[in-house]
Amino acid sequence: MTEKKWQKKWADEKLFESNPNDKEKLFITVAFPYPSGAMHIGHGRTYTVPDVYARFKRMEGYNVLFPMAWHVTGAPVIGIADRIKRKDPWTLNLYENVHRVPKDELPKLEDPEYIVRYFSSEYNEVMHDMGYSIDWRREFRTIDPTYKKFIEWQITTLYEKGLVQRGEHPVKYCPNCDNPVGDHDLLEGEGVGVNELTLLKFQIDDKILVTATLRPETIVGATNIWLNPDVEYVLVKANDEKWVITKEAHYNLEQQIKDLDIISEINPNDLIGKMAINPFTGNEIPIFPASFVSASYGSGVVFSEPADAPADYIALKDLKKNEELISKYNLEEIIENVVPIPVCTVKGYGEIPAADIIERLGITDQNDEKLHEATNELYKIQHSKGTIIDSIPGFGGKKVRFAREELKEELISKNMATIMYDFAERPVVCRCGNNCVVKIMDDQWFMKYSNPEWKEKTHEVLNRETIIPPEIKNNFNYYIDWLDDWACSRKVGLGTRLPWDNKWLIEPLTDSTIYMSYYSIARFLKDMNPDDLNPAFFDKVYLNKDSDDIKVAPEIVEEIQNEFNYWYPLDWRLSAKDPVGNHLSFLMFHHSAIFPEDKWPKGTVVFGMGLLEGNKMSSSKGNVILLKDAIEDYTADVVRLFLMASAEPWQDFDWREKEVLGTKRRLEWFREFAGKVEEIKGSALDLTNIEKVELTRTIDLWMLSQLNQHIKASTEALEVFQTRKALQESLFLLKKDIDHYIYRVNHLLDKKDPAVIYVLSTVLESWIRLLAPFTPHTCEELWSNYGGKGFVSVAKWPEVDESVISSEIEKSEELVQNLIKDINQIKNMVGEDAQKVHVYLAPDWKWDLYKIANDVGKPDIGQIMGRAIGANIYDDKKEIAAVAKKVGREMTKTKYVGKINEAQIIDDALEYISNEVSSEVVVHTDDSYDPQNKARNAMPYKPAILIE
């Protein structure tokens, strides 16, 4: 097979093994994979983008390092192994039928380290099959003993700077694993944030209804409390108080509040219709039934503030119309008196903002999908621009965002409220299969991302970086400011132990922030004794700190240090968009804290998501195509080509079989074109020894001009990772131009015309190199078959020959095509067989007028005429005026490139034009034969036409 052949040749020649030399370096990395399952086509896009860029820069003459490793730390594989051991049907089906693990291998996956070995080995194989130009000498796993020593040094360095501290903090937590969890540990809920909720205490008899809210300032407008009559509530002891919350809320809250014991179950129906006391106002408010109240979010008890909460407004409105519920709970006398109480004022809304937005969006009931949109819109604008109404004592006139915090603190200080934490959305499911909760950890180690000085320095890193796409920079700024202390240790999983507290393991997002620097020296460390890799060693290599504690020989340390200094800083970091709020931001934090400024990363590219036939890809749901299957079905080059052409890297791509098949056909055409060029030549092609020919025909010059324009545009696109645009230029548009050229010179193809052979050979030679980063196997094969020297993978990237790019030549071919189009349109309108077509060309004075108009730069007829008359370009001023008006209209549509020799251009293409219009064509440079006075209509770039 062609692809296997070239992969072996590259490996045998060690083509992509990169060592320091005197070339300019380019160091590119992509997020290393967590190999807990098979590679799918989404992964294919992730790892093909950096490979295309690496290959491109290598051909540009850079010394390129593109390494790969395996991120295997953390608890996910522990959970997978446990579920397989328990014979969990869903997990067994996933690994047998989606990840395609052979049945005899499945029992071995009960060992988490075997999972890591199995899938990292499979990833390695598939990456080879995709033709990735990786320096495999630098491969490692994050549980390798030498890597663990590196992580110990990293965490110790941060600890000594006071950036790792023990403390109390809310974290995502799996009670089953007894472990904090990060996104990598989750089956569902990746990227879900943790909200701080205020628990407000509404007294009812000797009990307290504890309501959870994100907006404590709205308590002044509370009209009622909502309880869900269909869920289980419990009475719990909280210090000296008795709280009413849902049973599910108790499960969550006991991870945050100590000694939260259940006293008894409580029937919500016994409370509905009774009155509770608002802790802030002292007013009594009723308790109403509401099926929309979630048992699992917050406390399961909600106060209603219909003036500013669209959901509360519409729920109250619906309840007032529900005679059955009103009768069931005897609410007739109470409910009529419940009306919205104004709290916030914001420009563009009335006294009751919720009513305004519900009316504007046409929301009719609680089931309306637009209700969520209304809530988000109103909450957002009130938080940013809203103020508390003047009539509220102590807070009137204050901005909502300030009043919220002040009122919360006042309520807490008076024991009218407390704090809890919950997920912004659910479910959040650990890879072990259990639901996660938010837990307050009081013996946990944290990264102090809350440190303001550290944040400021991290912003400096960001400001120096090139971010692609640029708009993502705002996201980074947001997350750098937003990030709080981060739980950086775990009790369960694979990984490196905290050097000073070895009951804890370093969690997987913390041990993957500066590993790019490890790539630079990994090839040396593989065979070294881990015990020799103490902090003093890494201090010397990375920070040039001398120490008597270094155990490695000085000459080896120097070589390793030189390697690091050659490759660092990292030029480009590529990753999906999900890690912007964690891994990619952590990378900037850690680089700012550990490395000097000249070692800070230089650029980041953020990817979009992958779809499969319009639906989101998900391994856990089986909605994926394995990359190895796609390679087998279509070849690696087709897969690469489709992934790079379907969307820019930061856009979402959609794998559609019909379009993939179309891509396959285009690649087949490319191969066929190479054979066709050799067939036209009539002898073996030698792309390194193309016989140059002096070109005179416009169409030949046009083809080389177009080729070089595509080279230029493709190069510019690739420099900024625009793979789709690069392929639009170097494949699709170039192919269109080649098709046109071949059609134009069709009558010469069997005549061994030297110019045609030269042009097509030149195009093919450049085209192979242009597509080599995208379809390396195909291009190596063609390069080898048609006389290319060495590997095209390291051949010189096509240089733009500016001397052959000509707007005049482009305009010349445009003239020919427009002339054919105009003649055929007129013939169709006339409806008669034309024996002869007369073409009249514009006289010189009209060209002079066009130049004057171009110099004026705008359709200012007065200026154009004035200059034309002053230059005495033509005697008939009335005619100048008429033509000047036409020029004024045309100059906004037609680009002026200077005078072109229309007579020669048309004469050059006369046979082609005559064939295309099926008539004899006669060209006139004057009006000596002009029976219908058509010549006067001739304009530059647009000849006049007479049909006979």
Question: Where are the regions that the model predicts?
Answer:
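Protease-associated
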Residues: 216-301
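C-terminal low-complexity, glycine/proline- and small-hydrophobic-enriched intrinsically disordered tails
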Residues: 661, 790-948
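Amphipathic alpha-helical
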Residues: 2, 6-7, 159-160, 164-186, ...
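Alpha-helical recognition segments enriched in aromatics with Gly/Pro capping
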Residues: 201-204, 277-280, 284-297, 306, ...
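Non-catalytic terminal extensions that flank enzyme cores
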Residues: 1-41, 58, 64, 282, ...
